[in-house]
Amino acid sequence: MSNVDAQHTEELGVETELEGTVVVPAVPTDSVAPLFTNPADWFVPPFPEKLEGLDVSAGFLADLALKTVPLDAECSTASIAHRMRLGMLITEALLQRLTHEKLIEIKGMVGLHNHRYAMLDHGWDALRRLMSFCSYAGPAPVSLKSYTEMITQQVRNRPPASRQALDQAMSNLILSDYAKEILGLVVGSGRSLFLTGPSGNGKTATARALVDALPGEIWIPYAIEVDGQVIRMFDTHSHLPVPHTNDDYDRRWVRIRPPLVVVGGELTLASLDLAYTETQRFYEAPLQVKSNGGVLLVDDLGRQRCSATELLNRWIVPLEYRIDYLTLSTGKKIQMPFEQIVVFATNLTEADLEDEAFMRRMGYRLHAEAPSAETYTEIFLRYARSRGIFADENLVMQLLRKYQTEGRIPKACDPRDLIDRAIDRCRLLRQPIKLTEQGLEVVWKGYFGLPHTDPKR
């Protein structure tokens, strides 16, 4: 394949349905990079031995140390080193600098390179000035350059997902081999996915399973520094730390599982930029930055507070060039890496969006159809087993006939919802947990309401 043909194939992407045929684009052999089993094992951030070896200025770190001193009643070199995630020698050098500037004083010795410190009056004055500019006090940040290099190397040297890993990640879903192959291509390539289909047929669950198929872990910093400003990166809601057996690494970084960030109707254009408040006086990374190295799921596209067209236009440059531009409160724009799998899940059609430029940039497209009778039965029986309940296939057949009688289209989520409600009823009536025709009839009415064919509707 020529480079021109390869580029054309990449732009068009691949479109398929869950029950359809997969067309796999060829990849030029010269585009394959060396891959590692677990990039986090190869790109361990080295432990900094000296202050001069850090990628952030000593002056900035000294200011951060001054903001950290008052946080502990018994402040010591060790306590500051722990809070700032720096080595003892570097931390002691920063504190000695503050001592020479008459901002803090030594109150005693705890051990080798470990002293007790206290604030002086000049230190409190300096602290107030610093807090009026930036109130961040926590792990020392890394530079934007270091973050960009680290996240890019890790993501682009990630190995392809194995079929076994993909099958395990999708084990709770019932998908065709074709759909699994497309999802494997999404995971292996890191390209975006446009996931369409009626609501309730597993689009969100499928997107969530993608992150479980991503191999290995990644390193991210707690924070980054740009022009003396701090952007907090680590988020306990989005990032799950994993143990690292080797203690000889830069503790300003944390090893995590590939993150999953989910956003739905609450998404606004403003939430895609740096969040800055006057009270904390530092920035919070936007959701697409927090999802770097993992999966960003834009769920229920078309129901956001901004229009779908505005939102899609915002993503065109990042999807095309793998970079994003964010704006500081000063008006300065900074360039951020855009290294994640973006999944757009929607019940809209491509015709509804009417954005050809955006659709060209979709790596892959997948359509989730309503389940067939066989698939519905398998979903029902499998979920019943997972809840420890026996399910008679005859009961499932009766449910399928009710769909036809009432003019309803089955959804993949219906078996779970009906079984859960049947369990609710058994518990309410203090009956043994089991599925019965009478019980399912009651919860059916409570779940669906009046049939579509009922004249009272």
Give, region by region, the residue ranges found by the protein language model.
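Short amphipathic alpha-helical interaction segments
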Residues: 84-100
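Conserved AAA+ ATPase small/helical "lid" subdomain
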Residues: 377-441
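Conserved ASCE/P-loop NTPase catalytic core
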Residues: 174-343
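Short acidic, hydrophobic short linear motifs in intrinsically disordered regions
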Residues: 71-83
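Short, amphipathic alpha-helical interaction segments positioned at domain boundaries
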Residues: 52, 113-163, 447-456
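A short, conserved structural fragment
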Residues: 99-111
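Dynamic helix-loop-helix/coil hinge segments at AAA+ ATPase domain boundaries and subdomain interfaces
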Residues: 152-180, 406-409
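A short helix-turn-beta junction within AAA+ P-loop NTPase domains corresponding to the substrate/partner-engaging
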Residues: 314, 354-370
